[in-house]
């Protein structure tokens, strides 16, 4: 059954431009190279929730867990951590509608 990797974070203060360049030029293409299918991304503009919420898909939870153990993910994730704070992630079975 398809599964989602749901990630949430806030952009680190004073790193907005570098963050944006990284997301566009490295993070999203890197996720695709690993094999993730792009889902949706949301930006929170009001309230006490994570500023960014993104999900990507793979065919199963097992596939996601294997991808998260790979060197490509570790490198990509490590670089993301240079630009974000309050990062969280979880793996869930995909269902229709909004999941967080």
Feature names for model-found ranges:
Residues 2-3, 35-39, 52:
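Short, flexible segments with low predicted structural confidence
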Residues 3-10, 54-55:
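Active-site-flanking beta-strand signature of metal-NTP-handling nucleotidyl enzymes
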Residues 10-22:
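Short, surface-exposed ligand-recognition loops at beta-strand->loop->(often short) alpha-helix junctions
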Residues 26-28, 32-38, 57-92:
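An amphipathic, aromatic/His-enriched active-site/gating alpha helix that lines ligand/cofactor pockets
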Residues 41-44:
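Short, solvent-exposed loop/turn elements at beta->coil junctions and helix N-caps
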Residues 46-50:
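Short acidic/glycine-enriched loop/turn segments that link adjacent beta-strands
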Residues 92-100:
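Short, low-order "capping/linker" segments at domain edges
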């Amino acid at each position: 059954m398809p599964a989602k990797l749901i990630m949430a974070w806030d952009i680190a203060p004073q790193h907005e431009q570098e963050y944006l360049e990284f997301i566009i030029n490295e993070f999203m293409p890197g996720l695709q190279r690993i094999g993730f299918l792009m889902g949706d991304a949301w930006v929170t503009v009001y309230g006490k929730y994570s500023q960014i919420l993104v999900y990507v898909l793979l065919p199963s939870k097992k596939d996601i867990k294997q991808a998260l153990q790979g060197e490509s993910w570790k490198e990509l994730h490590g670089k993301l951590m240079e630009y974000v704070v309050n990062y969280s992630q979880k793996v869930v079975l995909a269902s229709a509608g909004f999941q967080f």
